[in-house]
Amino acid sequence: MGAALKMTIFLLIVACAMIATTEAAVRIGPCDQVCPRIVPERHECCRAHGRSGYAYCSGGGMYCN
């Protein structure tokens, strides 16, 4: 395969993985105040609200997987 085709396939796989992660994340309002804190505290808040762990913070809202 050519280098361009390999790169295109790789980028498609990365994009699909990012979409799957983003789509699985759910905003957890009570954890919004934890966004500025360290990552272990974010994970703990998500787990305390029945989720598997911290995904990301965006616009002051915390999203958990």
Swiss-Prot record:
- Organism lineage: Eukaryota, Metazoa, Ecdysozoa, Arthropoda, Hexapoda
Q: Which family does it belong to?
A: Belongs to the diapausin family.
Tell me one GO molecular function of this protein. calcium channel inhibitor activity
An example GO CC term for this entry is: extracellular region
Output this protein's name.
Diapause-specific peptide
Origin species, per record, is Gastrophysa atrocyanea
Give start-end of the signal peptide: 1-24
| Highest taxon in the source lineage | Eukaryota
What is the tissue specificity?
Answer: Highly expressed in the fat body.
The disulfide bonds in this chain are 31-45, 35-57, 46-64
Task: Output the InterPro entries linked to this UniProt entry.
Answer: Diapausin_sf (IPR038203)
Its main subcellular localisation, reduced to a broad class, is secreted
List locations, semicolon-separated. Secreted
Which stretches are annotated as coiled coil? none
Protein keywords: Antimicrobial, Calcium channel impairing toxin, Disulfide bond, Fungicide, Ion channel impairing toxin, Secreted, Signal, Toxin, Voltage-gated calcium channel impairing toxin
- GO biological process annotations for this chain's record? antifungal humoral response; killing of cells of another organism
What the protein does comes down to:
Has antifungal activity against T.rubrum. Blocks voltage-dependent N-type calcium channels (Cav2.2 / CACNA1B).
Keyword Zinc-finger carried by entry: no
